[in-house]
């Protein structure tokens, strides 16, 4: 008797909605990590942001090409940062022209006023690496081009680690994230792989169990590695989303948070400096945490609405 072939579905699924949900998870990890609620949550959130950036950039470049590449990066990443950088200059008062310049441009060099914003120059390093490699191998067939881009980005990890010794300030932990952006690009390249439903479920279940086991090592007194922990937290979030449909109130909340993930990231460092004072001044730490979350969220929503309105007016 003939049996129908087993249905094969994409091994990895990450549409715009799921990406937004993961952005929501990433920024929540950052906020909870920076306030000491989730151990190494900040590292896990940054790793997840970088993986999503690599994934999204490669998908975008494959569909749109490299035309307008830098304009898109400036409009979506650097320009929103610049206006907040101006605010940082006035509020944080960095000393010296070099510190002001680093703050406005997003460079680190140990001089940037808001130390959490080392991420801006870090992500632009990867944008540059991707652009150069894609240009070099742009004339090759699509499949070979993908392989060369992947190999080139893995080689770019070397200068990334070297630059971490001085280009980004010591506390950034930039060495911990050297594989995250290339990993996101690799996931984008592999997104068309299809597998039987049972095999797909088994793959992601094994991935989730492996991540959970590693994250539990500190409970057993085993010292973990920062870069592995960051990527493991990000991997666990991705695996959960592949296995469990997120719906209802949780989905709506994460989508909402994900929509404002970038402005939240831009402002949380600014309010984090105030948070330390609030912890001392308020009767309980949870009150300071709540004030920090509320202030960051209010500033992010207001700023993003103003920026979007300005962007729409300039595009008209």
Question: Where does each model-flagged region fall?
Answer:
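Membrane-cytosol interface segments of multi-pass membrane proteins
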Residues: 1-157, 248, 260-261, 280-316
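Histidine-centered divalent metal-coordination motifs
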Residues: 34, 265-268
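Transmembrane helices and adjacent periplasmic/lumenal helix-loop junctions
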Residues: 124, 267-270
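Alpha-helical transmembrane segments and terminal signal-anchor/GPI-anchor hydrophobic tails
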Residues: 156-263, 270-292
């Amino acid at each position: 008797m003939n049996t129908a072939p087993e249905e094969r579905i994409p091994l990895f699924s990450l549409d715009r909605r799921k990406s937004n949900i993961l952005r929501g998870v990433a920024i929540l990890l950052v906020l909870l990590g920076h306030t000491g609620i989730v151990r190494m949550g900040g590292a896990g959130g940054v790793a997840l942001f970088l993986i999503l950036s690599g994934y999204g950039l490669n998908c975008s470049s494959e569909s749109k090409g490299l035309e307008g590449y830098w304009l898109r990066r400036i409009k979506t990443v650097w320009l929103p940062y610049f206006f907040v950088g101006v605010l940082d200059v006035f509020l944080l008062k960095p000393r010296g022209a070099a510190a002001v310049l680093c703050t406005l441009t997003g460079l680190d060099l140990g001089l940037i006023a808001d130390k959490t914003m080392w991420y801006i120059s870090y992500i632009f390093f990867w944008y540059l690496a991707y652009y150069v490699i894609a240009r070099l191998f742009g004339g090759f067939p699509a499949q070979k081009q993908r392989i060369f881009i992947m190999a080139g980005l893995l080689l770019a990890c070397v200068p990334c680690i070297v630059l971490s010794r001085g280009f980004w300030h010591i506390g950034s932990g930039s060495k911990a994230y050297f594989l995250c952006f290339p990993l996101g690009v690799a996931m984008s390249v592999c997104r068309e792989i299809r597998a039987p439903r049972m095999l797909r479920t088994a793959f992601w279940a094994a991935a989730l169990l492996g991540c959970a086991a590693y994250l539990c090592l500190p409970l057993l007194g085993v010292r973990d590695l920062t870069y592995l922990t960051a990527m493991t937290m990000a991997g666990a979030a991705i695996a959960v989303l592949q296995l469990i449909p997120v719906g209802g109130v949780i989905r709506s909340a994460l989508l909402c948070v994900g929509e404002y993930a970038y402005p939240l990231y831009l402002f949380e460092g600014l309010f984090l400096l105030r948070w330390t004072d609030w912890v001392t001044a308020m009767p309980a730490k949870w009150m300071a945490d709540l004030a920090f979350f509320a202030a960051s969220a209010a500033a992010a929503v207001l700023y993003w609405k103003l920026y979007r309105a300005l962007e729409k007016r300039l595009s008209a």
